Amino acid sequence: MKKELVFIIDFGGQYSQLIARRVRENNVYCEIIPYSTSIEKIKEKNPKGIIFSGGPNSVYGENSPRISKEIFEIDVPVLGICYGQQLASFILGGKVESAKVREYGKTAVNLDNKCALFEGIDKVQECWMSHTDYVSEIPSGFNIVAYTDGCKVAAMANEDKKIYGVQFHPEVEHTPFGKKMLKNFLFNICELKGDWSVTSFAEEKIKEIRELVGDKKVICALSGGVDSSVAAVIVHKAIGDQLTCIFVDHGLLRKDEGDQVESIFKEKFQMNLIRVNAQDRFLGKLKGVTEPERKRKIIGEEFIRVFEEEANKLGKIDYLVQGTIYPDVVESGTDTSATIKSHHNVGGLPEDIEFELIEPLRELFKDEVRRVGEELGIPHKLVWRQPFPGPGLGIRVLGEVTEEKLEIVREADAIFREEIANAGLDEKIWQYFACLPNIRSVGVMGDERTYSHTIGLRAVNSSDGMTSDWAKIPYEVLDKVSIRIVNEVKGVNRIVYDITSKPPSTIEWE
């Protein structure tokens, strides 16, 4: 069955993937496409709705992202968000100006709830604004359907042509009515049915991989984390023994993790699994390296090189499976947004890679990946395993990575995870881990002065990895963790707890 499709046209907005997630929550399939996509290609896919993302540019900028006016002539409902509204107004003959004072943060907005976009929503609401430019004059055929004290065109609509624009961000949690507004756009305006689900996604992906691969051989970059595990199971269901899973034990894993991975995939899933012990090789390459981006690149490149060597032993291999997911992609930047940090799944690949990539989860958020995993029958414990970056403890040891430092952070992390589980918080907190900042401090232990390592504890709550809040762990739990680490882990005399959210911080320290 052909699924309904909504296109999100990306103009460089930091929330483009979040818009996609909000659409998917309504069981509507969507794809994010660059603003440079031709109108012909858009028409070919027959979308039922189009959403313009926000973006950091001004419509008057020399190199600002644009789109052809034809997009409004293909008889498909359009919703422009922030820069998307400004661009729609600009293209259709309205005026956009730069404000004297930037409007940023929570703002009261007055809505015309006779407009289909705001149907069933109370007239006075709170929304999230983040803009400098604004629509000062709407195009012919449009009406103003929302305003704030600082923005006279907080939303505009041409209901006959089903073209809408909002200056605020309906996709973020800070706009409480945003989900209802997007639902109105999808179901009342675009008249969608909501026929997409993770079950249908998995079925289609298995079929797609089977057709793509044919009788060729595939290897999978298996780490034992949720993403690579679900990716491996999807591909295994598609092609069976044509898949060989290569588990590179780079010595940067959590305590006992290597043995657990080997046991689960060999015994539970009966997969072809090769475990490669490459700790000395990775630590050798990382010796003396302190810059985080360089560490990521080294780990990513060495990871692939190990794969190439194993592939040569197996004969002709055509495809490599990776567990890349949406937040991996957005954190590595796009054509229209600045790079935050290169992600191990997308930024560390050498240019001369010898395999074609299969990334079955590239379009999914973490919560969707977990749901797919459960649909595929992967054990609950594995599906809800803590997110763990590909570079592993290599980026949780800040500065140079050594065997001694790895052992310290590995033991501290195991204690932290154990106490979180003992407190019944292991499935209530989205992600939690210990890291080793490149800091030593003075302490007193056994009446003697010490000058030892500091351990940083990080725990956050999130549903998709795009944004997160620091977790409010009970003091008594933190106290127990601190006492145990200082007493049980040699070389540590101080524990700190990270209380910053994302943004401004990323979840990992490096």
UniProtKB/Swiss-Prot annotation:
Pfam families: GATase (PF00117), GMP_synt_C (PF00958), NAD_synthase (PF02540). The keyword Transmembrane does not apply. One of its GO terms (molecular function) is GMP synthase activity. One of its GO terms (cellular component) is cytosol. Its EC number is 6.3.5.2. Pathway: Purine metabolism; GMP biosynthesis; GMP from XMP (L-Gln route): step 1/1. Disulfide bonds: none annotated. ATP binds at residues 223-229. It comes from the Bacteria. It is an enzyme of class 6 (ligase). The keyword Membrane does not apply. Residues 196-385 form the GMPS ATP-PPase domain. Keywords: ATP-binding, Glutamine amidotransferase, GMP biosynthesis, Ligase, Nucleotide-binding, Purine biosynthesis. SUPFAM superfamilies: Adenine nucleotide alpha hydrolases-like, Class I glutamine amidotransferase-like. Homodimer. Catalyzes the synthesis of GMP from XMP. This is GMP synthase [glutamine-hydrolyzing]. It comes from Clostridium tetani (strain Massachusetts / E88). The gene is guaA.
